[in-house]
Amino acid sequence: MRRILAGVAAVAGGALLIAGCSSAGSSSSGSSSGSTSSASAAGSAPVTVRLGYLANITHAPALIAVKNGYFAKELGSAGTVKTTVFSSGTQETTAILSGQIDAAYVGPNPAINAWEKSGGTAIKIVSGAATGGASIVVKPSISSVAQLKGQSLATPSLGNTQDVAVRYWLKQQGLTTSTTGGGDVAIKPTTPNSAAVLEFKSGQIAGGSEPSPYDVEMVQDGGKVLLSEPGTTTVLMVTQSFLSAHPAVVNDLLKANLDALNYIKSDPSGAQAAANAELAATTGKPLKSAVLGPAWKEITFTADPDAASLNADAQQAESVGLLKTVDLSGIFDLTPLNNLLSAAGQSSVSG
């Protein structure tokens, strides 16, 4: 039975909001008699994998893998996937660096931050999940970038992928921002994303740089897309310690991720329904079809993490002062993924 808990966990000297927590699969063990994982076959003791993700459509592979029981199926009797739903990728980075979770579906910039803060020792990106699916949406009266001067824009959190993207874009347009909300355009990190939508609807902010479905909800509330944000939106990262200790279990996570991606490709309508059902179970409210459809269309779900996009994300974060100069060499470990892709007759990806 799926369990959802609400609470706050103290992590790394700060308060970390946990929006929800559950065990994946049809039982608290997260196991399934219909599958025997490589870890179980090798006689290893059952493992609990603590997995984080966000309640966003850009994290649909995670939502679907939970809803359809793919994690439970692939792990078999090897263990349990215990999921925690976070409000932002920044929170996920804090959790993974403090040992609260073992793996996470996360945006590229939080993954880069985890790599940089740990000196390249904390995490590895083992797969992609989604590209696209984020936009800068503004009120309809704004028709030029110059009109953003003196306005406020929301982002999910300081240093997350959409936060970096809008700051960099504004800098390219000659407008300044600051981490404290100053500058020509005040950037306002707002959690949860739904709060940013409400602030936009009430006129408290001029717009936001938000992932799906929240950018679509802003458009539905009268906004217009000023800029669609391309590139990698979601990757799957694991701690290096967990990968080293449990490579077979990580392989099972990758299988479940591919199961979800294959389902998205083979049955888009069924995949949308599954993702929306899991969103409803997590947030208490499903997305309206008028939001879900457009949100889905702006995302490409793929196992390719797009290394070039990740490098660009790092350079942009450095440019706006949110990241120290960092060497991303070694951040990827795509060998397990490529072995699975090869076995399925699919093209390999590169890091």
Where are the regions that the model predicts?
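Pocket-lining segment of extracytoplasmic ligand-binding domains
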Residues: 184, 188, 192-280
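Conserved C-terminal helix/tail region of periplasmic/extracytoplasmic solute-binding proteins
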Residues: 315-351
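C-terminal motif of bacterial Sec signal peptides marking the signal peptidase cleavage site
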Residues: 15-20
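Secondary-structure end/capping motifs
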Residues: 246-324
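Bacterial N-terminal signal peptides that target proteins for export
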Residues: 1-11
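Bacterial signal peptide processing site
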Residues: 22-25
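Short, solvent-exposed loop/beta-turn-alpha elements that line the ligand-binding surface or hinge
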Residues: 72-78, 297-306, 329
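Short, glycine-/small- and polar/acidic-enriched structural segments
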Residues: 30-188, 206-209, 225-230
